Amino acid sequence: MGASSLPPAWQLYLKDHRISTFKNWPFLEGCACTPERMAEAGFIHCPTENEPDLAQCFFCFKELEGWEPDDDPIEEHKKHSSGCAFLSVKKQFEELTLSEFLKLDKERAKNKIAKETNHKQKEFEETAKRVRCAIEQLAALE
């Protein structure tokens, strides 16, 4: 069974797949944050127009940008997301038992749901603020 037959989220457990996301990564040889080291730390490259060096942990979904050539990806990951369970996994993906993998992936799924829920809550609060402001402006016209 090849990596391409895995669900997309599970493909990210494979370091080589994470490495492949680092297209146009600005830090290559002679740097601490090479694509290989970034992938080892759980990161994928997800650049935007304004953040060309944006990287996100596929597991805890922590996003970091503003990388410097001497930044150590594992240390930066620990500093900004010390509770990420991916950092404590001592086995390669292929060495995990099914039970270990499913427990780990349950944590990843919970992280994803928490991130999405927080994002939706912020969107809701911003919309509520705009609506409240519009209502107050209408009330002031009376």
Curated annotation (Swiss-Prot):
Recorded GO MF terms: cysteine-type endopeptidase inhibitor activity; cysteine-type endopeptidase inhibitor activity involved in apoptotic process; microtubule binding; protein homodimerization activity; tubulin binding; zinc ion binding
Modification sites for Phosphoserine: 20
UniProt PTM: Ubiquitinated by the Cul9-RING ubiquitin-protein ligase complex, leading to its degradation. Ubiquitination is required for centrosomal targeting. Deubiquitinated by USP35 or USP38; leading to stabilization. Acetylation at Lys-129 results in its homodimerization, while deacetylation promotes the formation of monomers which heterodimerize with XPO1/CRM1 which facilitates its nuclear export. The acetylated form represses STAT3 transactivation. The dynamic equilibrium between its acetylation and deacetylation at Lys-129 determines its interaction with XPO1/CRM1, its subsequent subcellular localization, and its ability to inhibit STAT3 transactivation.
Binding site for Zn(2+): 57, 60, 77, 84
Database matches in Pfam families: BIR
BIR repeats: 18-88
Record-listed N6-acetyllysine modification sites: 23, 90, 110, 112, 115, 129
Official protein name in the record: Baculoviral IAP repeat-containing protein 5
Name of the coding gene: BIRC5
